[in-house]
């Protein structure tokens, strides 16, 4: 029975038609923080308690009322004129959506729900889409607003230079729609009109997740079937959807395609994977974040996993998020988390024995330091898991648990957008201005369309050291990119690896090494990689000249002659565009009259160099205007 995967084949198929009722949570992009507020992070592992923080009390009452008005129909949470789930993967966010709008996983397990339906005019953020799959949910790209055109077919432009949108069909709260899962179409209530193609939401793999109640069941089901078949000495029955293989003979490989081909598991010899292929890949580095860590622990316990996968090069449990609010709840939860993860086989930011001092550096900064191969795949429990070496994917707590337990992950090879630079950066400009200018120039080159969304940003800045490259790659999370890759030259990569070695050595000197010798192993791997580069055996990762890209963006550095500011356009006539960071302006736009209500320097996307710049600005101001007084709680 197990060798035939009857545990899966005997499950009921998903419904042919799903009747849904819409609930618009907000206009514009919806952050996962709306579904699971960061301020309530301490309760994420307690689903009943954390569920009370979902959106607002008012929204919860409206959702309950819709359920009563439409018995037998499922609710669909919508980001009107925006993207659903930006900012992070946030497993607790999709858990909350499922709790309020999904279906109970088992009558014997309270507050654990699955199968939520979420949607956005511009689809689902890539990092959140994975989390939707974990719960066997459906993520719908509505496309219900389109560019308005004049009689000549040209886009009509808004007061901020972006295209004016017009409504193609309504999804106002309380609208009844039908999802045809066989035809993969979104229909009006009586099924007479096709509103949108939703085939992206119903790939063969996604349908399996829906049928099984989540992606983990499929991952472990496959392992169970293979184990049973090997035990019996028979071939496993072909039950699960075959992995999609996209291969174009004669076509070169982008950087991410090279990394995936290097790390792919179970691919027939000689098969080359291009964008669109489904791949099981070996993971090199895994990071667990401290506010989602308790949920990762729950997942590991549910998997009966007791020790870290031996195929991983490195794994780290951070203590950064709770460090800034070291309250009673954090003090109660964090030591237990560190003790579990340390015993499981991770290097931990806090010492369960209390010997070495706490290392509260931001998780992605540490992961950047312990990544010692430009061909590595990194999985991290934080949306800003973006490295200057290798390719890194932010992931939900469950995917992190899978990577820790199995040392592998299922990922579709993403398309890439190539970003190159021309001209020279002025001496008085900061690299942050290049980051902002990239966004502004990309939007200008593609008529306001964000071509980065859901794709890899392949950045060609060969001489950029790890910390600067990290500033760029970290920002790509804000542009809804799937991930990013920095293409270095040989000398720069060697220098970045030497920096990584020195920082790992500091961790060893502090006493953070674990019995497996993981940190020393990373230094040894860095030495090996440096030797490969110096000998010419394996130079720094580069794409092939004949690689195919979804788009190419050229950033003109000569155009950047003054600081750039990302400033929400709160007066935009389109409500959905008032609170996004897509409006980039030069500082001269404000004429020196911009009022600043609050200043904060210290996000995960800055480093000490940025703080030095701010300090110098204040010194200059003090020289001109006298002493500056601070009135901030964290200074």
Question: Where do the model's predicted regions map?
Answer:
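Fe-S-dependent hydro-lyases/dehydratases of central metabolism
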Residues: 1-635
């Amino acid at each position: 029975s197990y060798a035939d995967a009857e545990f899966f084949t005997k499950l009921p198929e998903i419904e042919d038609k799903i009747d849904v009722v819409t609930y618009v949570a907000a206009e514009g992009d919806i952050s996962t923080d709306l579904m699971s507020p960061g301020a309530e992070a301490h309760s994420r592992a307690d689903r009943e308690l954390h569920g009370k923080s979902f959106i607002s009390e008012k929204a919860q009452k409206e959702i309950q009322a819709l359920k009563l008005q439409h018995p037998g129909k499922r609710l669909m949470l919508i980001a009107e004129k925006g993207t659903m789930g930006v900012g992070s993967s946030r497993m607790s966010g999709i858990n909350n959506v499922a709790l309020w709008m999904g279906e109970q996983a088992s009558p014997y397990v309270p507050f654990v729900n699955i199968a939520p339906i979420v949607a956005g005019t511009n689809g689902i953020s890539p990092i959140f889409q994975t989390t939707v799959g974990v719960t066997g949910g459906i993520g719908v790209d509505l496309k219900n607003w389109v560019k308005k055109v004049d009689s000549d077919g040209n886009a009509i432009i808004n007061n901020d230079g972006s295209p004016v949108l017009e409504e193609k069909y309504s999804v106002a709260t309380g609208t009844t729609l039908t999802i045809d899962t066989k035809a993969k179409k979104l229909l009006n209530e009586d099924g007479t009109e096709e509103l949108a193609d939703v085939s992206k939401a119903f790939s063969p793999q996604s349908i399996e997740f829906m049928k099984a109640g989540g992606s983990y069941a499929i991952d472990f089901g496959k392992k169970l079937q293979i184990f049973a078949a090997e035990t019996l000495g028979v071939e496993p029955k072909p039950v699960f959807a075959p992995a999609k293989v996209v291969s174009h003979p004669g076509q070169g490989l982008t950087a991410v395609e090279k990394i995936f081909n290097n790390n792919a598991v179970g691919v027939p010899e000689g098969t080359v994977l291009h964008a669109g292929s489904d791949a099981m890949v070996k993971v090199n580095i895994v990071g667990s974040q401290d506010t989602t860590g308790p949920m990762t622990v729950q997942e590991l316990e549910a998997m009966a996993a007791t020790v870290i996968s031996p195929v991983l090069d490195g794994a780290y449990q951070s203590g950064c998020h709770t460090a800034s609010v070291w309250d009673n709840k954090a003090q109660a939860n964090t030591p237990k988390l560190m003790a579990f993860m340390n015993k499981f086989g991770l290097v931990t930011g806090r010492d369960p024995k209390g010997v070495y001092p706490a290392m509260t550096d931001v998780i992605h900064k540490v992961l950047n330091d312990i990544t010692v191969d430009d061909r590595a795949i990194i999985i991290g429990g934080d949306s800003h898991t973006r490295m200057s070496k290798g390719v890194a994917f932010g992931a939900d707590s469950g995917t992190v648990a899978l990577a820790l337990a199995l040392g592998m992950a299922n990922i579709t090879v993403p398309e890439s957008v190539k970003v190159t630079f021309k001209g020279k950066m002025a001496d008085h400009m900061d690299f942050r201005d290049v980051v902002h200018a990239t966004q502004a120039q990309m939007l200008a080159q593609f008529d306001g369309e964000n071509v980065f969304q859901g794709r890899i940003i392949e950045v060609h800045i060969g001489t950029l050291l790890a910390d600067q490259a990290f500033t760029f790659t970290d920002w790509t999370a804000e542009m809804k990119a799937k991930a990013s890759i920095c293409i270095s030259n040989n000398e720069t990569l060697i220098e970045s690896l030497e920096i990584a070695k020195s920082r790992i050595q500091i961790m060893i000197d502090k006493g953070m090494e674990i019995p497996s010798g993981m940190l020393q192993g990373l230094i040894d791997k860095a030495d090996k990689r440096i030797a490969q580069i110096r000998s010419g055996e394996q130079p720094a990762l580069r794409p092939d000249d004949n690689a195919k890209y979804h788009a190419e963006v050229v950033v003109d550095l000569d155009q950047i002659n003054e600081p750039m500011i990302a400033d929400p356009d709160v007066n935009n006539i389109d409500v959905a565009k008032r609170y996004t960071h897509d409006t980039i302006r030069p500082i001269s736009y404000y004429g020196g009259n911009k009022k600043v209500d609050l200043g904060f320097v210290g996000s995960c996307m800055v480093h000490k160099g940025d703080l030095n710049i701010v300090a110098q600005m204040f010194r200059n101001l003090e020289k001109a205007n006298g002493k500056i007084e601070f009135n901030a709680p964290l200074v």
